[in-house]
């Protein structure tokens, strides 16, 4: 017997009660994952692009947050074991994250991802890390006031950056860098990967990372990197 495809019968085939509520909740309530970044780091950039891919194939939503490589290396690690050239680069690393913090103060945390994308595309994909035009261009692209660029040379938002940074590193420890992600209350460094996994490959990596992160007593998986960051 074939049941006619009428509006009444379509309604009768819909999930009811608790089943319908659960299905609706699953569709409408993606899992929040905290992602700490410094726009200067090429490895964090690649991982952030992976995170955006994960959002397309898994019920996950990134909550973008700030950390500072300058604060980590110059203050918390006191520059130990770093070359003078690296220390000089770190001293300049304050600028971009200060602008990001000022933008969040101006427009709210929702601006973090688009501004990070605008800055990171220029820094990493276009290879313009030393170009002073990057910050003004990124602010213009995201519809933010050009005046926010002045925050690069101001300490007004340093405490905001440090507070966000410390939230991550109080959980994950000081012997790591960026990115830091927190999944279901468990913070880890990484994953460090290149090039960016896309589509279902991104989803499978997410599944594995989420699984090991929830394992009691899990601390580390690591091997030496044998290739440079790829921004394809």
Can you say where each PLM-predicted feature lies in the sequence?
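N-terminal amphipathic/basic-hydrophobic helices that include classical n-h-c signal peptides
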Residues: 1-22
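Short glycine/proline-enriched loop/turn "hinge" motifs that connect secondary-structure elements
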Residues: 26-27, 180
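Local sequence-structure signature of Cys/Sec-based thiol-disulfide redox active-site neighborhoods
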Residues: 27-51
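Short strand-loop junctions, especially beta-strand C-caps/beta-turns
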Residues: 36-38, 122, 193
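Structural alpha/beta surface segment adjacent to cysteine/selenocysteine redox centers
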Residues: 45-135, 208-212, 220-223, 229-232
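C-terminal cap of thioredoxin/glutaredoxin-like
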Residues: 50-51, 129-232
